[in-house]
């Protein structure tokens, strides 16, 4: 069993710096382990709805002027469709004679039989996150200056968003089909969770502001790259090389997409360093909430927290990863080397550049407290037929 690095028992002071329970970091779930069905699922409270359209109108011109740059520097990071992998390449071939097709399905089930239930909790959570893609395209199209104004706009920003969505669409399709064929998960509850999540939307705190939006997507793509890479590692060690290749292939896509969004923020830092570094600080003060933070299966109102706790325990995505991503972005964007900033820009720079170290110190204290408490909880996950998992 992998080491359990808990995010429990924060004081109020610690919580002002650490990711909130609605982030992708795991916090110790509280309350009864057995979740009873309720008539109307309660969506987690929204936190960032009071600010909209916060980018000054004059900065709209920045994104208009960057359309040519985005065409030359961002669109080439997409792959032509005929060079992209497709889910069918990884799955049993239904065009084969029936006996050969069923043999391939049987082999898939034999491979997945060695994977523990807790692994499926994490894999299903990742799949559901990927499957809520309509929400993410909608979110990007709320951003002023870069949205697709017509649904088929030829601007570089709109072209990127549509093609990015098309590439991402393969991820959920592939994982969902693999899970379906494995027989290890309750697809009815998985599908209900997807529908709930898309219906709930997301609340990332980007305020229709592309500065904030592209900081968010930079962090989020890096986080999904890390998560899928770790599920690949676990699948390989548990004896499913095909699933390992699937997760690794998805991780490679996320890395390429991360590079695009990181490159956009780099350009904004070049053109408007004060505005861009302030946007980074703004998003980090809010704490990056990952796309599926409003997840529910209709029964467990803390499903996202419970899923995140399992991901933390399996070291698929941890508090250390959160700090690592922040350090990576600070280095990639060379934030420590920015010069000529205003007072506000300098304060933002100091906050962001020192934040990862502060997070690590607070996490070390939380880990020490968790070791002393030595408490675990059993939680039923509907995705795996109400089996109990320690979190």
UniProtKB/Swiss-Prot annotation:
Catalytic activity, EC: 1.14.19.2
Annotated residues for binding of Fe cation 2: 168, 221, 254, 257
Pathway noted in the entry: Lipid metabolism; fatty acid metabolism
Keyword Cell membrane attached: no
Uppermost EC category: oxidoreductase
Signal peptide, first to last residue: none
Keywords, alphabetical: Chloroplast, Fatty acid biosynthesis, Fatty acid metabolism, Iron, Lipid biosynthesis, Lipid metabolism, Metal-binding, Oxidoreductase, Plastid, Transit peptide
Primary subcellular site in the record, as a coarse category: plastid
Superkingdom field: Eukaryota
Role noted for this protein: Converts stearoyl-ACP to oleoyl-ACP by introduction of a cis double bond between carbons 9 and 10 of the acyl chain.
Name of the featured protein: Stearoyl-[acyl-carrier-protein] 9-desaturase 6, chloroplastic
Annotated gene: S-ACP-DES6
């Amino acid at each position: 069993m992998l080491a359990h690095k808990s995010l429990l028992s924060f004081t109020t002071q610690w919580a002002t710096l650490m990711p909130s329970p609605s982030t992708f970091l795991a916090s110790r779930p509280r309350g009864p382990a057995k979740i009873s069905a309720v008539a109307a699922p309660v969506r987690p409270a929204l936190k960032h709805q009071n600010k909209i359209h916060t980018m000054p109108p004059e900065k709209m011109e920045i994104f208009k002027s960057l359309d040519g740059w985005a065409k030359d520097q961002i669109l080439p990071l997409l792959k032509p469709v005929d060079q992209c992998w497709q889910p069918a390449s990884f799955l049993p071939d239904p065009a084969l004679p029936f006996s050969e097709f069923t043999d391939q399905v049987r082999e898939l089930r034999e491979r997945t039989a060695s994977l523990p239930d807790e692994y499926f909790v994490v894999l299903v959570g990742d799949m559901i996150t990927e499957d809520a893609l309509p929400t993410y395209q909608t979110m990007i199209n709320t951003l002023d200056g870069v949205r697709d104004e017509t649904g088929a706009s030829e601007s570089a920003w709109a072209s990127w968003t549509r093609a990015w969505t098309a590439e991402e669409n393969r991820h959920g399709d592939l994982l969902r089909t693999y899970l379906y064929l494995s027989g290890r998960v309750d697809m009815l509850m998985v599908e209900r969770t997807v529908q709930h999540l898309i219906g709930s939307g997301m609340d990332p705190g980007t305020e229709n502001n592309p500065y904030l939006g592209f900081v968010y997507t930079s962090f989020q793509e890096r986080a999904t790259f890390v998560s899928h890479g770790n599920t690949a590692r676990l699948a390989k060690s548990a004896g499913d090389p095909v699933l390992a290749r699937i997760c690794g292939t998805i991780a490679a896509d996320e890395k390429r997409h991360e590079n695009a969004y990181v490159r956009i923020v780099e350009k904004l830092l070049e053109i408007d360093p004060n505005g861009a570094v302030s946007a980074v600080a703004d998003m980090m003060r809010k704490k990056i909430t990952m796309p599926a933070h409003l997840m529910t299966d209709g029964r467990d109102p803390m499903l996202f927290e419970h899923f995140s706790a399992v991901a933390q325990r399996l070291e698929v995505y941890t508090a250390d990863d959160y700090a690592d991503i922040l350090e990576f972005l600070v280095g990639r964007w060379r934030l420590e080397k920015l010069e000529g900033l205003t007072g506000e820009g300098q304060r933002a720079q100091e906050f962001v550049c020192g934040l990862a170290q502060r997070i690590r110190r607070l996490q070390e204290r939380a880990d020490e407290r968790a070791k002393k408490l030595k408490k675990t909880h059993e939680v039923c996950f509907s995705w795996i037929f109400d089996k109990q998992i320690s979190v």
